[in-house]
């Protein structure tokens, strides 16, 4: 299942349980950060109180991934495991470990993978195909210029503000391509 970052909050609000695997990926850092925050918050609301973060690289020891999933805290029965792949490539060890991991979900464990979207070659790799097949994918792509005024209006509404269409258009011209700057300006 694939969602875009803009529809994630509504989707999570309707879920009584989270899927075992989530993948937040794309090229828009702000949307990736906010999507991961939404997933963390919803997991906490649903009782996933044990949280562990792994940052894995191509040279990492990938055996820690299944070990981390298997080790739930003594006083917890649900775990939120966050796996960050900053390079977007798992390397040779991860190429093997990742598909094996997503084939066997661990009961009571939700795993969130965050990474930039791989290039076209990476998207053909078996590890990527296995991850996309097993996970609920949250696509975090840049907001197109045509949708930017609407995106800004939504941000302003959430902040208790309004603006006329021409103001939103001018605002969009100023921040085009930089959603973080747009978020900061709306927050002022």
Model-derived segments and their meaning:
Residues 1-188:
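Conserved beta/loop motifs at nucleotide-recognition and modification sites
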């Amino acid at each position: 299942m694939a969602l875009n970052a803009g529809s994630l909050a509504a989707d999570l609000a309707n879920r009584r349980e989270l899927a075992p695997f989530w993948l937040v990926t794309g090229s828009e850092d702000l949307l990736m950060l906010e999507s991961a925050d939404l997933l963390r918050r919803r997991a906490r609301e649903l009782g996933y109180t044990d949280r562990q973060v792994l940052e894995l690289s191509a040279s990492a020891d990938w055996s820690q991934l299944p070990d981390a999933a298997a080790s739930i805290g003594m006083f917890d029965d649900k775990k939120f495991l966050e796996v960050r792949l900053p390079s977007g490539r798992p390397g040779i060890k991860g190429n093997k470990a990742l598909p094996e991991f997503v084939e066997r979900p661990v009961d009571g464990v939700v795993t969130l993978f965050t990474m930039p979207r791989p290039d076209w070659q990476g998207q053909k790799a078996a590890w990527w195909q296995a991850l996309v097949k097993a996970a609920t994918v949250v696509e975090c792509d840049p907001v197109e210029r045509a949708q930017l005024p609407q995106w800004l209006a939504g941000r302003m509404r959430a902040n208790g503000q309004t603006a006329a269409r021409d103001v939103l258009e001018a605002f969009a011209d100023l921040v085009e391509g930089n959603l973080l700057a747009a978020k900061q300006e709306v927050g002022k």
